[in-house]
């Protein structure tokens, strides 16, 4: 609703922050939504994807660790294959990104690993101002995905119990809704819905409805502790194994063959 409203509304750019711990599925949710949004547009406006000026409704970029504004903007522009002058400043690249997004009619900008935008209080104010400029100049919806990004970085309006005084940071935070991504409860409707969705996307010849969402729901939860990201990784490896061995179906026996990841082992210790 926020994305569609932004396309047809002339108001200020709006945003969504997906915040939570590592392995909780923030990236999976973001990529899944972005993919479905672009597919819906492709089905509705197929000719738009064949026009002379490239139509790129969604931009996705995983931000760099320890990088400043200029490096981050350069990294995002690489998604478009856009050449960048070595003499350009961070502000120049912000303007360049806005120009490219408008040319490509990008409505949705997804910035993953957004905790890497946190570079220090004063510089966070500068980042907040630039993000606000991008949202307004490109008239886009911005999705920020990262570890606890509602507590630190350009979206944080309080640090150490003190309210931030930066107008840019406050204005940016007021435009964002925050979705806290948490592990899903065993047997919950949300957990069942997640596994059902994964079932519909499996490209396995012999998979059957309910294989994951009913028959192996508890087994998958035990291996992932309800963390969406861990569950996705587990089932992706299991699906590839089923393809490689010719079984074309995820079973309990096959699932036991998938070695637990370091991510899963670490998360399980934290929950315990």
Q: Which role does the model predict for each range below?
A:
Residues 49-50, 58-66:
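A short hydrophobic beta-strand->loop->alpha-helix junction that borders the nucleotide-binding pocket
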Residues 53-56, 67-75, 82-141, 187-190, ...:
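Mid-core helix/loop region of P-loop NTP-binding domains shared across ATPases and GTPases
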Residues 36-48, 82-83:
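Post-Walker A helix-loop "phosphate-sensing" segment adjacent to the P-loop in P-loop NTPases
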Residues 3-13, 51:
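Phosphate-binding P-loop
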Residues 116-120, 127-211:
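The catalytic "switch" region of P-loop NTPases
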Residues 185-272:
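C-terminal alpha-helical "lid" subdomain
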Residues 10-32:
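Walker A/P-loop nucleotide-binding motif
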């Amino acid at each position: 609703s926020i994305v569609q409203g932004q396309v047809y509304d002339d108001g200020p750019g709006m945003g969504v922050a997906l915040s939570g711990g590592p392995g909780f599925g923030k990236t999976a949710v973001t990529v899944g939504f972005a993919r479905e949004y672009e597919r819906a547009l492709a089905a509705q406006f197929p000719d738009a994807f064949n026009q002379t000026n490239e139509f790129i409704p969604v931009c996705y970029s995983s931000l760099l660790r320890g990088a400043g504004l200029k490096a981050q903007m350069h990294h995002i522009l690489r998604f478009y294959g856009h050449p960048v002058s070595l003499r350009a400043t961070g502000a120049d690249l912000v303007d360049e990104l806005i120009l490219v997004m408008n040319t490509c009619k990008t409505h949705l900008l997804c910035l993953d690993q957004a905790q890497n935008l946190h570079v220090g209080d004063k510089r966070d104010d500068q980042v907040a101002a630039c993000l606000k400029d991008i949202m307004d100049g490109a008239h886009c919806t911005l999705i920020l995905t990262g570890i606890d990004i509602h507590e630190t970085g350009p979206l944080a309006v309080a640090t150490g119990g003190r309210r931030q005084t930066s107008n840019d940071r406050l204005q940016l935070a007021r435009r964002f809704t925050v979705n806290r991504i948490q592990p899903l409860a065993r047997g919950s409707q949300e957990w069942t819905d997640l596994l059902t969705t994964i079932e519909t996307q499996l490209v396995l010849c012999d998979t059957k409805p309910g294989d994951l969402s009913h028959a192996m729901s508890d087994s998958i939860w035990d291996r992932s502790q309800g963390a969406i990201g861990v569950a996705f990784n587990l089932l992706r490896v299991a699906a590839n194994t089923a393809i490689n061995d010719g079984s074309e179906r995820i079973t309990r026996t096959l699932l036991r063959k998938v070695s637990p990841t370091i991510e899963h082992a670490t998360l399980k210790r934290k929950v315990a």
